[in-house]
């Protein structure tokens, strides 16, 4: 099984869209490093952003084509695919199972006992081919804490890899941006895939954390280099 760092996704909507249209023979356990409420709030915020951008685009085009009809126009076409109550979407949702781990301790505990009892099916007991684990925003959860170090990240990475190996599943780590207002998805080093380039100290003990999540006066190493012991960067 493969352990990959996936950098192709920029937002939670981008990720969910891809999972919906994924191969129907695969099942994904999506481990979200936040509370359920925070996750839903982020999804709703991004849907609103998508709707606003789509409505603005449609409105401008309609105004150019038929300015007298603009007040009477509605914008059903701006609705996102994830909001469409189709049988295809319902079927796709059965292939994706969500788990929420709002703290580092919760995440490590969940991974140490993975898979939970209600995830175990007769099919899983026979084989685990076509099953994936995807952990979303692991780095964001660690960033700004005393666990954002080689020692702390190695502990969590090892727990994730152990869970995947134990269940013979492929593993992907995904970092998404929370703020999608900017078109430049790589402009903020403290969000999304930029966190893989962050420098972290070696040990979790006796470090001082600034407001921006950085530390003072310690030997450092890049997060990507720490992860390279277990993971490789997904191509494409």
Task: Show which residues each predicted segment covers.
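N-terminal regions of ATP-driven nucleic-acid and macromolecular assemblies
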Residues: 1-236
